[in-house]
């Protein structure tokens, strides 16, 4: 099993470690609820170095990535990032990813840990059509640290005084020096809170992690495991590969039409998406349940007549709302907020209702 550059720190801090995407990763330290609340109320530090990262370089790099992904990469400029998808020809999802435009001929990609090898092979299998474009896998050399929460920019200002990180627009990034190395600081995240994700060489990861933990001590910063990362993203309704999105899911039936630009030139999966746009059958929705039973992936969902209408994608008890919440893929007729539903949990029908997403921070743009 692979380890990140921060694994020894996590173990020394008493983290409970698990296998995730082939990496030994912290699932929790003090506990999921306490860590979740730290991010919502103060600040949390995440090691997400298990994520894959690639460089795509060459004069035709933009053309190549436009063909491979659904969003319109021509709309962003140097120093900007974009959330996007890679699709199979039938419209199924290869992965969701973020692409960072470093320059006109250099792009940096961050992909899901569990899909890293698959994604690299998928990109490699099409790159031959674009002469002069190179694909490089830097996953084993780079660490990724996320600082998230309302106190994030106060903490960053102590470690990087005068850098102006707080002035970064959403999905923008800058490069900064840190202990003789160049690091990339991006205004991105997976929690719905203010914050950044920082990419840097493995050799500098412990030093930066320690500096941020020390700088955030007075603000109540906490190290955060993958357990709270999941409850935080679920409260926001963000997709997770293998749950809301996967091989046999079309993005237009998963609340991701906004990243599928059917008006741009051809990309893999475009025709399949055009067909689904004409006649979508289902949608990913949020829901909450009465009582305390926790909905889990693949649990069946029923309508008021006890007819099966879909299944659960993700579920948990929301630490913020203190009630069971989840996402489900439902037939379109039952996707409207307020629609009554029932989830079968251990042989019992648990009543609930479709909810508007996100569950928290609905007032934010």
Swiss-Prot record:
Question: Could you tell me one molecular function GO term of this UniProt entry?
Answer: transaminase activity
Q: Disulfide connectivity?
A: none
Q: Which reaction does it catalyse?
A: N(6)-[(R)-S(8)-aminomethyldihydrolipoyl]-L-lysyl-[protein] + (6S)-5,6,7,8-tetrahydrofolate = N(6)-[(R)-dihydrolipoyl]-L-lysyl-[protein] + (6R)-5,10-methylene-5,6,7,8-tetrahydrofolate + NH4(+)
Q: What is its EC number?
A: 2.1.2.10
The protein's UniProt keywords, in alphabetical order, are: Aminotransferase, Transferase
Quaternary structure?
The glycine cleavage system is composed of four proteins: P, T, L and H.
The identity of this protein, by name, is Aminomethyltransferase
Q: Which organism is it from?
A: Chlorobaculum tepidum (strain ATCC 49652 / DSM 12025 / NBRC 103806 / TLS) (Chlorobium tepidum)
